[in-house]
UniProtKB/Swiss-Prot annotation:
Transit peptide limits: 1-15
Organism: Solanum tuberosum (Potato)
UniProt protein name: ATP synthase small subunit 6, mitochondrial
Intracellular or extracellular location(s): Mitochondrion inner membrane
Protein's membrane topology: Single-pass membrane protein
Family the UniProt entry places it in: Belongs to the ATPase 6 subunit family.
Amino acid sequence: MRQFDPWPVFFRREWSRNWPFLVGFAVTGAIITKMSLGFTEEERKNSRFAQRHKN
């Protein structure tokens, strides 16, 4: 006898409540990644934030 697997039921039920969070998280991550990769080496060198967090 197969055991009942609750995960598919859980994900199907919770998807309608959680999709805005997941999509927002993905969009925010894509924007941050795109902006970060767009910096030139000169901009990184002159950044006050980067200077403060340099090891």
